[in-house]
């Protein structure tokens, strides 16, 4: 499993935790939830690039 996939999973878990806290009225958890979403977005972009590179490498290998 790539590092970006691990990061996505970790940040998703963090987001779920913080979002639940925010829903219960903890406003500070909202900032942490947004940060987790931002980190997840970065990791998702990195994974998209990894997938594209692997796809192109497979194309060239044929």
Positions of the model-derived regions?
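N-terminal acidic leader/helix
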Residues: 1-21
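Secondary-structure edge/capping motif, primarily at the C-terminal ends of alpha-helices
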Residues: 15-23, 29, 51-54, 58
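Short, charged, amphipathic alpha-helical segments
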Residues: 30-35
